[in-house]
């Protein structure tokens, strides 16, 4: 007797028919005519237009500047290679979980560890055909996200179960469910071709990218294409890419999504050209580095950026100038680019009678953003940052705020805090003017003191004035609502020394120095923490991590025991160098620092491996088995 599963029973109830199709596991295969068609209604989108014919290619893009064909004809050295990267997961420690409570007033309260509470509210309402105002989402302290905790997963199910049961319902994914059911980042195929003159000027670059979207459309392939050659001032560029559905979990963001894959190709070829031209790899990059006014292939020109300053910092660092000692030791470098996001952010600031302030914002803190946001508000109000008490609130308390991702939080939500603090400052000046009976324009806030410019005897500290608010017109609350567009961008670089075990193919990281342009490091130790964390994840991506599927398409390493992420036992201390080239699109020059740091490590490690062994790798991860195979073939 075989007991039927709930799934089998449900198939019988609804009279379903199942059509078994051949698996599609990679983007290159999924884009061919030989592959199975996974969706009966999917057609390729090209800049908003749907193309005829069923396909697994969900979308296609193309960016071009200059005359690429002529530029390659004029190039004196051309290198073209193909690269493949495996599917990898963000590896957050806390699994997906949600608690929902359907109340008697037909409103539902959701508690969830998410990077985007307002997005969860909107998507849950859309999924369940509810009004947005019926749903309140409270973001909890989040145990890691890295871009992977934006999508909607169990929330609608928990809401419906709570409605039916009349009780709160909590759902927690197992680790296996996290790996198999939530969004990893894309596996990819990248083809890269770069042409240069004998003097070392890059004049042509071409890229083709095919990224896995998972079961449904939406890979970061276009972002990868925009970042692919962004570090360099190249007059002739062509980048094309496709988003391909495959039989894997629907992808989600992972720190600078798409950029790490494409940068592996660009930076290893850049390194190879430098070697063939007998040029120092940093000098070669400096000769061709993007600067203010450089136009990217997708159109925009860079404002003031820190690419050359970053490379100069790398060139002058003791790590670069120290000797390489020991057998099978190699040194490599790479640089990378990622955008800063803007988007809507809201913040409110309330002044307390003791002179402290409560700052309320709607973007969850997953990297110390509460501290950096509070410090920006304190700067405006000329008070001690310890007097600012920041908190992240639920969706009923504040206007719509974008989530914590895209390197936007310290930048955009910090800017909202600046605007709220400016509102408080102006209201405090107006209150002081009312108390003193003078014009507002006659009052300034200096070093925490409100001072009359015409009468030096008229002055009140921030705390003194705060204590008088209730009796002189009532409390003061400031509002900040902003959606910045001048968001800039960030560059990161690595110098890495590796040791290769030529008997096993194992790569050990001996020394690692991370560089990043932070614009203005509001909280330097938190910036360093972000740089170190992203670097470690980039190292894991380079040498350990991958989704391993068997011939039947089943994931075989869906636990932390089998999905090998680096730990402190595998790594040296990650040294950090913060470069500060102020972002002209922010009041304090801030650039996002949470993502760019994951972009260059795989390429830097691949270049170090070449320096140690003479072999060029074009796959991720560079696991011992893959490296050993290349060593044997090379010998």
What do these predicted ranges mean?
Residues 1-9:
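Short, exposed "boundary/linker" segments that immediately precede the start
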Residues 10-12, 16-17, 21-515, 606, ...:
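Structural alpha/beta core scaffold segments of enzyme domains
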Residues 257, 408, 579-597:
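Amphipathic, heptad-repeat alpha-helical segments used for oligomerization and assembly
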Residues 328-336, 555-574, 583:
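A glycine-rich dinucleotide-binding beta-alpha-beta segment and adjacent secondary-structure elements
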Residues 389-391, 567-590:
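Generic long, charged, amphipathic alpha-helical segments
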Residues 519-523:
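Cytochrome P450 core scaffold surrounding the K-helix E-X-X-R motif
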Residues 525, 529-562:
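Active-site "cap" helix and flanking loop/linker of ATP-utilizing ligase/carboxylase catalytic domains
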Residues 540, 593-618:
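C-terminal substrate/ligand-recognition segments
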